[in-house]
């Protein structure tokens, strides 16, 4: 174990924690929780189920936020006690435990520090992530599947539940497209920096001549709507198509037309769902995602940020945000933040927190510069 100046490190932890406390405004947080708790305890709360759901959901999010902060404060105090005992008794095991806990707290504070930067209108929401294969043929489809696994592994590492909502398999290998939900507070604010075009450079395993291939995939992230969001879509604006669910290689995995495709005629936004067991369930899931996309579309139109609209991301040379190079060298590099990592296997296994953190800070700096 390397020599660690625990006194200096603990002072740094406390300084970072106090900075987060000031930004969070603990007094306002506790007042918000008290007010929401009072409203949640009203006997007529569930007379309006949609409003009740919003209140209880926000209360849960705010309580989790307070718990994260208070737990970290306790862990810093406990670390200080552990270090004192270890040093007084010359206990190498205790000091090793203290070093591991120091690293763990530093990481937790860093993650919490990034969360304080998430102040967008929908940043607290759960997220729906869609991945589409772009230019590059079968390599692009394979890349889309690699990205899907990367994000699902990232969510798994954080203990975030996920639900795969739709998968459209390519003929030879990989995915044409996929959609999944990440069920965690701030999932949208966190993952929205991943939206854009991703590029893969490697020796193609599908090329008999072993040539280097460049392929692309587009990632879209939208906030999941809540029941109280005002998004009404007239029936005459939606075209409904039903078809049989398909698996790898285009084979049918269902004997009934349970898969559903919804097209919003005025905007051209298309949503497909096939992973639920019934057509009714797929239609309900597709409608919720369609409403979510239109909600974000409306906000982005109001903000005149049309570049990020659903369907506007072209999975080709333009608008690249990250490159994954596996040959002639190994490097994953974010083209916006310049953050790069040489361990490509770890990245594809879901270790992307540093990319996300850098992306959130980059976005915050850009927003502040525009003010």
Curated annotation (Swiss-Prot):
Gene3D superfamilies registered for this protein in UniProt: 3.30.160.20, 3.30.70.1660, Release factor
PROSITE patterns according to UniProt: RF_PROK_I
Keywords: Cytoplasm, Methylation, Protein biosynthesis
Chief place of localization: cytoplasm
Pfam family, one: PCRF
Cellular compartments annotated: Cytoplasm
GO cellular component: cytoplasm
Presence of keyword Protein biosynthesis: yes
PTM entry text: Methylated by PrmC. Methylation increases the termination efficiency of RF2.
Alphabetized GO MF terms: translation release factor activity, codon specific
InterPro entries in the record: PCRF (IPR005139), Pep_chain_release_fac_I (IPR000352), Pep_chain_release_fac_I_sf (IPR045853), PrfB (IPR004374)
S-S pairs: none
Top-level taxon of origin: Bacteria
Function: Peptide chain release factor 2 directs the termination of translation in response to the peptide chain termination codons UGA and UAA.
UniProt similarity note: Belongs to the prokaryotic/mitochondrial release factor family.
Protein name: Peptide chain release factor 2
């Amino acid at each position: 174990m390397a020599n660690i100046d625990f006194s200096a490190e603990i002072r740094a932890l406390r300084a970072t924690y106090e900075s987060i406390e000031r930004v969070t405004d603990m007094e306002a947080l506790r007042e918000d929780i008290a007010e929401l708790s009072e409203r949640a305890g009203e006997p007529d709360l569930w007379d309006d189920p949609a409003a009740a759901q919003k209140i209880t959901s926000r209360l849960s999010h705010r309580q989790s936020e307070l718990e994260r902060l208070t737990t970290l404060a306790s862990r810093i105090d406990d670390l200080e006690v552990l270090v004192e005992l270890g040093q007084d008794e010359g206990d190498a095991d205790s000091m090793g435990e203290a070093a591991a806990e120091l690293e763990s707290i530093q990481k937790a504070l860093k993650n919490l520090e990034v969360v304080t930067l998430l102040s967008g209108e929908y940043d607290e929401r759960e997220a729906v992530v869609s991945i589409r294969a772009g230019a590059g043929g079968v390599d692009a489809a394979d890349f889309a599947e690699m990205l899907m696994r990367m994000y699902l592994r990232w969510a798994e590492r954080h203990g975030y539940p996920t639900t795969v909502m739709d998968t459209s398999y390519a003929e030879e290998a990989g995915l044409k497209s996929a959609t999944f939900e990440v069920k965690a507070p701030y999932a949208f604010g966190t993952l929205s920096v991943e939206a854009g075009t991703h590029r893969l450079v490697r020796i193609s395993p599908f090329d008999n001549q072993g040539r280097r291939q460049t392929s692309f995939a587009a990632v879209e992230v939208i906030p999941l709507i809540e029941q109280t969001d005002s998004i009404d879509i007239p029936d005459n604006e939606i075209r409904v198509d039903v078809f049989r669910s398909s698996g790898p290689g285009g084979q049918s995995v269902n004997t009934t037309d349970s898969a559903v495709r919804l097209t919003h005629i005025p905007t051209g936004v298309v949503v497909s769902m096939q992973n639920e067991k019934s057509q009714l369930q797929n239609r309900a899931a597709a409608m919720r995602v369609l409403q979510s996309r239109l909600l974000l579309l409306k906000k982005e139109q109001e903000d005149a940020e049309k570049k990020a609209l659903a369907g506007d991301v072209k999975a080709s040379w333009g608008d690249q945000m990250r490159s994954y190079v596996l040959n002639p060298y190994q490097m994953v590099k974010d083209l916006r933040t310049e953050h790069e990592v040489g361990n490509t296997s770890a990245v594809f296994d879901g270790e992307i927190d540093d990319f996300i953190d850098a992306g959130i800070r980059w976005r915050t700096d850009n927003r502040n510069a525009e003010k």
